[in-house]
A protein has these predicted regions:
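Surface-exposed, charged secondary-structure patches
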Residues: 75-116
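Acidic, low-complexity intrinsically disordered segments
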Residues: 41-44, 83, 134-138
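Conserved short acidic donor-positioning loop in nucleotide-sugar-dependent glycosyltransferases
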Residues: 48
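Positively charged n-region of N-terminal signal peptides that target proteins for export
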Residues: 1-4
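Short solvent-exposed beta->alpha transition segments
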Residues: 51-90
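Bacterial N-terminal signal peptides
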Residues: 7-17
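Short beta-strand edge/turn micro-motifs at domain boundaries
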Residues: 112-138
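Short, low-complexity N-terminal intrinsically disordered segments enriched in polar/charged residues
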Residues: 17-44
Length: 138
């Protein structure tokens, strides 16, 4: 009887723990979707609609990345890095004031880079950065 009770209690504890971690998964899914929508600017010839993208930008980023700058972003990235060939999800980091989602990407001119997306507590995109990775030379 005691063994059955212990097994039952352990099962309930495991179910409760699974529920506690579910929020992180939902946040990650939403933030990945926002990041992938934003990265469409690097994939496609025709830009995604700015009004759709701007729905998920924080107030500060909406000011810093207006519609004209958004249009210029594609040209600037293509000039500096080339055309985006591949993007793979790399990491999800949770912080007190927001989250960070990172992708390993490959461009024509820059074979290995990272695109980092920073989100606030409300899952609005606060900032992004494209960081080229260089091989260490001996």
């Amino acid at each position: 009887m005691k063994k059955i009770l212990v097994v039952l209690v352990m099962g309930l504890i495991m179910m409760f723990n699974g529920l506690c971690f579910a929020a992180d998964g939902n946040d990650l899914n939403k933030e990945q979707k926002i990041a992938e929508d934003f990265m469409q600017v690097f994939w496609q010839e025709q830009l995604p609609n700015y009004s759709k993208i701007s729905e998920n930008l924080s107030g500060k980023l909406k000011i810093d990345l207006n519609e004209k700058q958004y249009i210029d972003l594609q040209k600037n990235v293509k000039d500096k890095f080339g055309i985006l060939k591949e993007a793979k999800f790399y990491s999800f980091q949770r912080f007190d004031q927001g989250d960070r989602v990172s992708y390993l990407v490959s461009f024509d001119k820059q074979p290995i880079s990272t695109i980092i997306f920073a989100f606030d507590k409300n899952q609005k995109l606060e900032n992004y950065a494209i960081v080229p990775l260089q091989k260490k030379t001996k």
